[in-house]
C-alpha cells in the first residue's frame, strides 16, 4: 500500500494564527479517493527544520505532499530547503519565468523582482503547472519518496491536487480507482445516537462507515471499495436512510444551505428571509453559492423591535403581549418578509442566542422560527440550552432550512430532533 504523508509549512500555521484548512481539505479529499494519509507534520519557516523533515520523512513515505512556502518573500523556503536536502542548487526554470511575465502582463501589472524567486527550482525538480497562480509547483525524488510541492493558497492547492497530484499518484503507483462514496448529512441528532442505529447493521464486505462532526451537521460517510461493494452501495445507502429517518436532511451535500440552493436554483420559486438572532446567517450561507440571485429576493436583519414593526409590519401589540421571541412575532415577521416582494416562501428567526438575555420563561437558547408560504405559516419555538452563541445561531439556521426543505418535498414541515427540544404552542 502506498504510504502518503503531508508536510504543512508556515510559522502562522504552526503557531495557530491561522487554522490549517488546507490540511483538513486534503485529508478529506484523499479519503474520498480511498487513500489514507499516514502522517502529517507541521513545520515553521526555519530552513534547517524543513531540510531535516524532508530528509527524515523521505526515508519512510512513498509520497509527501508539501504545502506552502512557494511565494516570493524571504520566509518562503520550500524550494531552497528541498535543494539543500538533496544537495542540489536552485536553477531558474525558464518556462515558469515566462509564465510569471505573461501573468503580470495579462493583469496589467509590473512584475516585482522578488517574484523571480518563484521560478527557482531544485536542479532535479519536475515542474508542476499552476495555471491559476504565480507559485510554481514541482516534484522531486528523495530517498524512497516523491515530494510534491504545492501552493499555500487554498484555491491553487485544490486545483493542483485535483488536476495534477491525484492523476500522478494513480499513474505512478497503479492505484485502483474502484472506490465510491456516499455522504448523508444529518442535523439534530448526536453522533452516538446515530452510531447506535447504524452499528447493528450488517454491512457487506468492502463497505465501511465513517462519521464527521461539523456542527450543526454530522456527516455520515459510506465508503465502498471494490466492484461488488460499489454495486451494493445504493441499497446500503437506502437502508441507512430508512433507519435514520428524519435525521437525514441531504445526500452528497456539505451543508443544508447547499441542499436548499440546489432545490431552489432554476425552480422558478422565490425566497425572502427576515432574521433577528441569526443575524443574516441564513442569507449569507445561500449567497455563498453562485446563482442564488435567481431565487433569493431579499434578506433582512431586523434585530430591534422597531425594525420588526417598521420594516416587516409586525404589530406593536404583538410585541407587547408576547415579546420578540415568540411564535406570534416570528409568524408576523415571516408574513411581512414574504409580502414585501410577494415571495413564494419566507423564513424568519427570533431568539436568545446568549450568553445573556434569558429569563426563566425563555432561557438562553430559546429560538422561534417560522416559514411563510402562499397557503399558510408554519412555526415552532425550539430549545437549545447549554450551547454557545455561535451554535445556537447555526442550529437555528439549520432548522429553518429543514422546514423549507420539507415543505419543498411536501413532507411534514415540523419534526422531532433527538438533540433539539421544542416548546409546545
Curated annotation (Swiss-Prot):
Protein name in UniProt = CinA-like protein
Q: Which SMART domains match?
A: MoCF_biosynth (SM00852)
Which Pfam families is this protein grouped with? CinA, MoCF_biosynth
The record's annotation in InterPro entries points to: CinA, CinA-like_C, CinA_C, Competence-induced_CinA, MoaB/Mog-like_dom_sf, MoaB/Mog_dom
Protein family membership: Belongs to the CinA family.
Amino acid at each position: 500500500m502506498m504510504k502518503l504523508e503531508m508536510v504543512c509549512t508556515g510559522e502562522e500555521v504552526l503557531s495557530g494564527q491561522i487554522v490549517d484548512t488546507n490540511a483538513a481539505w486534503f485529508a478529506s479529499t484523499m479519503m474520498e479517493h480511498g487513500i489514507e494519509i499516514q502522517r502529517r507534520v507541521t513545520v515553521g519557516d526555519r530552513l534547517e527544520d524543513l531540510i531535516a523533515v524532508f530528509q527524515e520523512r523521505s526515508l519512510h513515505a512513498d509520497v509527501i505532499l508539501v504545502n506552502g512556502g512557494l511565494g516570493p518573500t524571504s520566509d518562503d523556503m520550500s524550494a531552497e530547503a528541498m535543494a539543500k536536502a538533496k544537495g542540489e542548487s536552485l536553477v531558474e526554470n525558464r518556462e515558469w519565468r515566462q509564465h510569471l511575465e505573461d501573468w503580470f502582463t495579462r493583469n496589467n501589472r509590473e512584475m516585482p523582482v522578488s517574484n523571480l524567486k518563484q521560478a527557482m527550482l531544485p536542479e532535479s525538480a519536475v515542474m508542476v503547472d499552476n495555471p491559476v497562480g504565480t507559485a510554481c509547483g514541482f516534484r522531486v525524488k528523495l530517498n524512497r519518496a516523491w515530494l510534491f510541492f504545492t501552493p499555500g493558497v487554498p484555491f491553487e492547492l485544490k486545483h493542483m491536487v485535483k488536476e495534477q497530484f491525484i492523476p500522478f499518484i494513480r499513474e505512478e503507483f497503479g492505484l485502483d480507482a474502484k472506490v465510491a462514496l456516499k455522504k448523508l448529512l444529518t442535523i439534530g441528532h448526536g453522533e452516538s445516537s446515530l452510531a447506535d442505529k447504524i452499528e447493528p447493521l450488517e454491512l457487506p464486505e468492502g463497505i465501511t462507515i465513517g462519521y464527521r462532526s461539523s456542527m450543526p451537521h454530522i456527516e455520515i460517510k459510506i465508503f465502498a471499495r471494490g466492484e461488488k461493494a460499489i454495486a451494493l452501495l445504493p441499497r446500503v445507502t437506502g437502508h441507512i436512510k430508512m433507519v435514520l429517518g428524519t435525521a437525514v436532511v441531504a445526500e452528497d451535500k456539505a451543508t443544508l444551505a447547499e441542499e436548499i440552493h440546489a432545490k431552489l436554483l432554476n425552480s422558478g420559486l422565490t425566497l425572502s428571509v427576515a432574521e433577528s438572532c441569526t443575524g443574516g446567517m441564513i442569507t449569507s450561507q445561500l449567497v455563498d453559492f453562485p446563482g442564488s440571485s435567481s431565487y433569493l429576493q431579499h434578506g433582512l436583519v431586523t434585530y430591534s423591535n422597531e425594525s420588526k414593526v417598521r420594516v416587516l409590519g409586525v404589530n406593536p401589540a404583538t410585541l407587547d403581549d408576547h415579546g420578540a421571541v415568540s411564535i406570534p412575532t416570528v409568524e408576523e415577521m415571516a408574513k411581512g418578509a414574504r409580502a414585501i416582494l410577494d415571495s413564494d416562501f419566507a423564513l424568519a428567526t427570533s431568539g436568545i442566542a446568549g450568553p445573556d438575555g434569558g429569563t426563566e420563561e425563555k432561557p438562553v437558547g430559546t429560538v422561534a422560527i417560522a416559514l411563510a408560504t402562499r397557503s399558510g405559516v408554519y412555526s415552532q419555538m425550539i430549545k437549545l440550552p447549554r450551547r454557545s452563541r455561535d451554535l445556537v445561531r447555526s442550529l437555528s439556521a439549520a432548522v429553518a432550512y429543514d422546514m423549507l426543505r420539507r415543505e419543498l418535498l411536501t413532507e411534514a414541515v415540523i419534526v422531532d430532533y433527538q438533540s433539539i427540544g421544542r416548546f409546545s404552542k
